[in-house]
Swiss-Prot record:
SUPFAM superfamilies: PRC-barrel domain (SSF50346), Translation proteins (SSF50447)
Keyword field contains Chaperone: yes
Annotated protein name in UniProt: Ribosome maturation factor RimM
Region listing for Disordered, in residue ranges: 1-29
Main location: cytoplasm
The family this protein is said to belong to: Belongs to the RimM family.
Name of the gene encoding the protein in the UniProt record: rimM
Domain named PRC barrel: residues: 150-231
Record's subunit section: Binds ribosomal protein uS19.
GO molecular function, one term: ribosome binding
InterPro entries: PRC_barrel-like_sf, PRC_RimM, RimM, RimM_N, RimM_N_sf, Transl_B-barrel_sf
Amino acid sequence: MSERDSGSSGRAKAKRQPGAKAPFGPFVRKPVEKVEANAAAAQKARAESAESWPDDAVEVGAIVDAYGLKGWVKVAAHADAGHGGDALLSTKRWWLEKGRERQSTPCLQSKVHGDSIVAQLGGTADRDAALALRGHRVYVRRRDFPALGTDEYYWVDLVGLDVVNEAGIELGKVADLIDNGAQSVLRIEYPAIGKDGKPVIGERLIPFVGVYVKTVDQAAKKIIVDWEADY
C-alpha cells in the first residue's frame, strides 16, 4: 500500500507540499480415526474451488512453511502490515492457488510474527496438513481489504491507470510502484522508438507525492500529474 508518499498490494498517500493543490517432528503412525478426520476436513476445505474464485481476487502472499504443531501456516506477505499486508490480518476467507489447483478456506485467526504472518486455517488440523500447503499463493478479495483514509490508495488500484500531464499529454500507464524508502514512485511504461528504429517500451519514474501528482481519478482510470513528457 502506499500513501501518496509511502505496497502484488501496497497503499499510497501523497505528502503535502506547501502550495500543492493535491492532498494526498519425527515420524509417528497416526490413528486411523485422525487420518480420516483430517481427510474429511481437507475435503471440506476444497469444497469451494475454482468455481467460486472471486473476480476481484488479489494475490497478497505465499505460504512458505508450517508454524508450530497445531496446523498453523507461515505466510510471506507481499507487503508489510500497514502496506496492504494487513488484508491478511483482517479477512476471514483466503483463496489458495498452486499450479492448477485452487481452493478456498476460512482464516480462523492470524497475527504478525517477526517479518511474516502466521495463521490458523479451517481444515488444517496438524503440522502435516499445514506442510501440505507450502507453495500455495494466497489471495483475498479486493473488497475485503481494510478501508483507507482520505487520499490513500492501494497500489493494486493504481496499476493500469493512464497518466497524463496537466497539458493533456499522455505519459503512459502505471506498470508498477516502487518504494524507495522515502516515498512511493510511479513506474510508468509507454510505447517508444529505440535508437535502431524499432519499437521499445519506455519508462518514466514519477514520485507519488502531492507536488507532482495532482489528481487520482479511479473512476476515470486516470492520474493527472505536473510532469513534462521530456523530463
